[in-house]
C-alpha cells in the first residue's frame, strides 16, 4: 500500500476515535486518553487517573484535523464513506459545543471560547464556500407522499427520502438497504413532544406567539397550529399531514378529516393507514412525525425500514455558522441571509433580521441574551428537532435548569370534539383522565406516573454524569465527579 492509502485509513480510525472521545468528555468531563493498544502489562496506563478535558479536547481536534487532511474529497469517496467535509462538519460541531460551553460555564482555559468559536465559524464557512451543498425542498416522490396544495412538505420530505446519497443537503448519509442494513423509524415510537416545544414555533408573520395577532390560542389543535411556521405541521402530527398509502395504488389522507376528503381519489381507505393523533398514541398529544415514513412498504416493514438517514446535514453547518458569528459579535444581515434565512426560505417563512422583536414570553435560560441570539437558538431547536442536539445544547448553554420544567401536553378537556381528528380523542380522554394529572388544563405527563414527577437537575452536578462505581472499584485513581460522591 502507498503511504497515502495508509494515511487515509488512519484518518478514518482517528475520526472515529475523536467521535467516541467527544461523547465521553461531554458525558464525564475528564477521561483517560489512550492512543495505543494496551496489554495487561501496561499497568501504569491501565490504572492511571483521568486526563484533563482540555487535553483530550486538544487530541480530538488533532484527530479531526488529520482526518480533514487525509480523507478523500466527497467526490472521490465511496457512497456513505467518510470524506473531508464530514470531518470539517464534525470538528465545527465540536468547536461550537466547547466554545459556547466555556463561555457560559465561565471556563477560561486554553483553547479559549473565542478561539473555538472562531474555528467553528471558519470550518463552517469552508463547507459553505465549497458550493457542493444547498438547502433542498424535499421531493414528494422520493418520500412516497403528496401534500395538500396549501400545506407543502418541503421540510418533512427530506427525512424520509429513500436515497440521500445524491441529495445536496446531505453531507454524509447513513445508507440503508433492505436485507442488508435496516432500521425501525417508519412508524415512530409513540413518544410525545412537549407543549414548551409546540410554543416555540413562530407565527407566519415571523413573530413569537406572545407577540403575534395571528396566534389563535390552544383550545384546539387546529387553532394552535393555524398561522404557524410550516415546520410545525411537518413535525407534529395533525390533519395537515397527508400520507401516501400504497395499497391498491391509492393516496389516502388521515382518516376522519372531512374537509380534506378531496385529496383522496377514493372514499375507501387503504390498509395500515396512518391516523391523526389520538391521546393513547402519544404521551402528550403532540405526536412527532418528522422521521415517520408515508410509504406503505416502509410502514409494513416495521423494524426493517430502509430509507436513508442524515449523519451530517448542511442545515447544521448553517446553524453553526450563524450561532458562532453571533457569539463572536459578527452576525450581520448578510450572515443571516446565507444561513437562517435559507432555512426559512425552504418553508416560506418571513426572514430573520439583525434586530428582531424580543419575545414577550421568553424561555428562561437563567441569564439574559440578545433577541438575535435568542432567535438563532429558537431556529436551531426547530430545525434540528429529533436529530440529537437539544440535550447537548442545553448543557453547553449552561441552562440545564430547563429540564426541571413540567412536561406538559395538549389541553384535551378543551378539545375533545374540535380536536377529535380520528374519532378517538373523546373516548381516549375519558379512559386516561384518571391516570393523568393536569396543569392549567394541559396534560402533565409525569404527575401520576412517577414517584418523583419533576426532574431534579442540580447545577453544577448534573452537567456531568457520575463515573460508574464499578469502574472506580477497578481503578481507584478514577475520582468521582463533583456532587456524585
Segments the model singles out, each with a brief description of its role:
Residues 186-204:
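C-terminal/domain-terminus segments
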Residues 2-189, 207-485:
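Acidic/polar-rich alpha-helix caps and helix-coil junctions
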Amino acid at each position: 500500500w502507498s503511504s497515502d492509502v495508509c494515511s487515509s485509513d488512519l484518518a478514518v480510525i482517528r475520526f472515529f476515535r475523536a467521535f467516541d472521545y467527544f461523547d465521553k468528555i461531554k458525558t464525564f468531563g475528564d477521561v483517560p486518553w489512550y492512543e495505543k493498544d494496551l496489554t495487561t502489562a501496561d499497568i501504569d496506563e491501565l490504572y492511571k487517573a483521568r486526563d484533563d478535558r482540555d487535553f483530550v479536547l486538544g487530541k480530538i481536534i488533532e484527530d479531526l484535523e488529520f482526518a480533514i487532511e487525509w480523507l478523500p474529497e466527497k467526490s472521490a469517496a465511496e457512497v456513505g464513506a467518510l470524506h473531508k467535509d464530514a470531518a470539517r462538519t464534525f470538528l465545527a460541531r465540536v468547536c461550537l459545543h466547547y466554545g459556547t460551553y466555556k463561555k457560559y460555564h465561565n471556563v477560561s482555559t486554553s483553547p479559549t471560547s473565542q478561539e473555538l468559536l472562531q474555528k467553528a465559524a471558519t470550518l463552517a464557512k469552508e463547507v459553505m464556500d465549497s458550493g457542493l451543498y444547498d438547502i433542498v425542498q424535499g421531493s414528494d416522490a422520493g418520500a412516497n407522499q403528496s401534500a395538500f396544495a396549501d400545506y407543502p412538505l418541503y421540510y418533512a420530505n427530506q427525512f424520509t427520502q429513500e436515497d440521500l446519497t445524491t441529495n445536496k443537503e446531505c453531507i454524509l448519509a447513513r445508507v440503508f438497504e433492505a436485507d442488508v442494513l435496516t432500521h425501525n423509524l417508519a412508524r415512530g415510537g409513540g413518544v410525545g413532544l412537549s407543549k414548551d416545544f409546540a410554543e416555540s414555533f413562530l407565527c407566519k408573520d415571523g413573530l413569537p406567539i406572545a407577540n403575534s395577532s395571528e396566534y389563535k390560542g390552544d383550545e384546539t389543535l387546529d387553532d394552535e397550529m393555524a398561522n404557524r411556521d410550516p415546520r410545525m405541521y411537518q413535525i407534529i402530527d395533525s390533519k395537515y399531514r397527508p400520507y401516501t398509502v400504497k395499497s391498491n395504488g391509492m393516496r389516502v389522507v388521515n382518516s376522519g378529516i372531512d374537509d380534506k376528503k378531496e385529496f383522496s381519489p377514493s372514499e375507501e381507505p387503504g390498509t395500515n393507514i396512518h391516523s391523526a393523533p389520538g391521546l393513547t398514541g402519544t404521551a402528550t398529544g403532540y405526536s412527532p412525525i418528522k422521521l415517520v415514513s408515508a410509504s406503505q412498504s416502509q410502514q409494513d416493514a416495521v423494524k426493517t425500514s430502509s430509507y436513508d438517514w442524515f449523519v451530517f446535514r448542511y442545515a447544521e453547518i448553517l446553524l453553526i455558522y450563524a450561532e458562532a458569528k453571533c457569539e463572536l459579535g459578527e452576525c450581520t444581515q448578510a450572515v443571516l441571509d446565507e444561513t437562517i434565512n435559507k432555512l426559512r426560505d425552504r418553508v416560506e417563512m418571513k426572514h430573520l433580521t439583525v434586530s428582531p422583536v424580543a419575545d414577550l414570553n421568553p424561555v428562561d435560560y437563567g441569564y439574559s441574551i440578545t433577541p438575535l441570539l435568542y432567535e438563532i437558538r429558537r431556529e436551531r431547536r426547530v430545525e434540528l428537532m429529533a436529530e440529537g442536539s437539544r440535550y447537548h445544547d442545553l448543557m453547553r448553554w449552561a441552562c440545564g435548569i430547563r429540564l426541571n420544567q413540567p412536561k406538559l401536553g395538549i389541553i384535551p378537556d378543551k378539545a375533545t370534539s374540535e380536536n377529535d381528528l380520528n374519532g378517538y380523542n373523546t373516548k381516549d380522554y375519558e379512559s386516561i383522565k384518571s391516570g393523568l394529572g393536569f396543569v392549567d388544563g394541559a396534560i402533565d405527563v409525569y404527575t401520576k406516573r412517577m414517584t418523583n414527577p419533576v426532574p431534579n437537575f442540580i447545577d453544577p452536578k448534573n452537567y456531568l454524569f457520575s463515573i460508574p462505581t464499578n469502574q472506580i472499584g477497578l481503578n481507584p485513581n478514577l475520582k468521582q465527579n463533583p456532587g456524585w460522591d
